[in-house]
C-alpha cells in the first residue's frame, strides 16, 4: 500500500464467486483421527452456511478446507454441474455460502478473520492464499480428476514422471511384527516391483517395548524380541 503509516488488515478474503441456479447442494467433510473425511451433503436455502476452523496449525484435524457444490440436484459421480474448491492455506480458514433473497449464491473463501489481524507496512504487498477450484458438467468424477491433473502438473514434484514406490508395514502389521513377518512383506513387495520399504512404529524400546501407543517413545533402540539382529 502507499500510505505513510502501517495499516491493519482485519478481514481479507481470497475470492468471491457468485452463482445462479434453482437449487444448491453443499458437500462438506469432517472427522477425526482414524475417522477422517466423512461426507455430509445438505441443501442450501436462504441465509448463511459457514465452514470454518480456529484450530491454527491443526486446522484440518476436524474440518476439511474442501467442498463440493452441486447445482440443481444432489451431487452425482458422472452427471451434473459441480463446483469443487479448496484453499491453499494450512491455518485457520473460512468458507461462507450465502443465499440471498433472489436465490443467488455467494461463496467467500479465505483466511479466517478470527485473531488474524495483520499489520502491513508502507510500500509492501500482501497476497492472500490461492482459492483453487474447478467446474465440472459431468459430476464429481470429472471434478476430482481435474484436481488430480492440476496437482500432478503444478504441485507434486515430478508429478508426470515415473516415481519410486514404497511399502509401509503399518497397516499390514501395526505393532505386531517380527523379522519373519517383515521378510514375508519384502518378498511380496519385490514381486510387485516396489522400490523401498519403510519400517513404521513398533520397532524400538526394550524395558517398555513399543507394543502399543502408550509406551516406548524416546527409547531409540531396536526391540530385541522383534528384531534380534537389529535393523
Give the positions of each predicted feature.
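Short, intrinsically disordered, charge-balanced linker/junction segments flanking boundaries
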Residues: 109, 122, 228-231
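Acidic/glycine-rich phosphate/pyrophosphate-binding loops and surrounding catalytic core
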Residues: 87-93, 99, 132-151
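Short Pro-Gly-centered flexible turn/kink motifs
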Residues: 118-137
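Glycine-centered helix-coil hinge/cap
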Residues: 31, 139-140, 156, 226-230
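Aromatic-lined carbohydrate-binding/catalytic grooves of carbohydrate-active enzymes
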Residues: 158-231
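Polysaccharide-binding surfaces and accessory modules of carbohydrate-active proteins
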Residues: 1-99, 103-105, 114-116
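Glycine-rich, acidic/polar active-site loops that bind/position phosphate-bearing ligands
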Residues: 115-120, 192
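N-terminal amphipathic alpha-helix/helix-capping segment at the start of soluble metabolic enzymes
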Residues: 120-121, 148-163
Amino acid at each position: 500500500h502507499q500510505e505513510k503509516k502501517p495499516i491493519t488488515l482485519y478481514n481479507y478474503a481470497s475470492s468471491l464467486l457468485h452463482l445462479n441456479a434453482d437449487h444448491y447442494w453443499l458437500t462438506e467433510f469432517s472427522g477425526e483421527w482414524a475417522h477422517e473425511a466423512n461426507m455430509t451433503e445438505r441443501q442450501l436455502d436462504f441465509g448463511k452456511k459457514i465452514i470454518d476452523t480456529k484450530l491454527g496449525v491443526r486446522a484440518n484435524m476436524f474440518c476439511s478446507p474442501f467442498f463440493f457444490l452441486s447445482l440443481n440436484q444432489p451431487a452425482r459421480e458422472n452427471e451434473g454441474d459441480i463446483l469443487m474448491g479448496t484453499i491453499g492455506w494450512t491455518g485457520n480458514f473460512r468458507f461462507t455460502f450465502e443465499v440471498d433473497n433472489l436465490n443467488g449464491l455467494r461463496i467467500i473463501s479465505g483466511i479466517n478473520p478470527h485473531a488474524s489481524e495483520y499489520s502491513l507496512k508502507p510500500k509492501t504487498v500482501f497476497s492472500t492464499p490461492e482459492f483453487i477450484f474447478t467446474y465440472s458438467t459431468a459430476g464429481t468424477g470429472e471434478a476430482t480428476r481435474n484436481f488430480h491433473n492440476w496437482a500432478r502438473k503444478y504441485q507434486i514434484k515430478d508429478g508426470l514422471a515415473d516415481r519410486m514406490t514404497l511399502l509401509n508395514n503399518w497397516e499390514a502389521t501395526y505393532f505386531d511384527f517380527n523379522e519373519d513377518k517383515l521378510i514375508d512383506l519384502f518378498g511380496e513387495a519385490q514381486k510387485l516391483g516396489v522400490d523401498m520399504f519403510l519400517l513404521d512404529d513398533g520397532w524400538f524400546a526394550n524395558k517398555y517395548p513399543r507394543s502399543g501407543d502408550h509406551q516406548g517413545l524416546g527409547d531409540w533402540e531396536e526391540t530385541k524380541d522383534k528384531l534380534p539382529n537389529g535393523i
